[in-house]
Amino acid sequence: MDELELRIRKAEKLVQDAKKEFEMGLYERCCSTAYYAMFHAAKAMLLGYGRDSKTHRGTIYLIWECREELGLSDDDCSKLSRAFDLREESDYGIYKEVSKDLAIKILKDAEIFVQKAKNAVNKNR
């Protein structure tokens, strides 16, 4: 199994983990895990096109830069950027709590993003 497949599998597992965290009422944790699912999916897509970055911000930048060839819309890229910002707030912030509504939105965004990544990786093979 190559790195692309491993990253897609990891992304799918993280989506399932985020669902469990949501069901347990762990909304901040859910958002963080959902972001990491999107991150691994993004890395898989980029690797499929011979691109990579060592940082989260760099990965997001490359996703924006390569969005057309990856078959992503501006909205798809915005969801990844939003999830990254929320993950930072969830992990490090102390002033905001993540609501149930926001957590379910980020979780759904992650499910869609991971599926699009899976489709892009399969198309590129």
Swiss-Prot record:
State the name under which the record lists this protein: UPF0332 protein AF_0298
Identify the InterPro entries for this entry. Answer: HEPN_dom (IPR007842), UPF0332_toxin (IPR052226)
Q: Which family does it belong to?
A: Belongs to the UPF0332 family.
Matching entries from Pfam families are given as: HEPN
Lineage, highest ranks first = Archaea, Methanobacteriati, Methanobacteriota, Archaeoglobi, Archaeoglobales
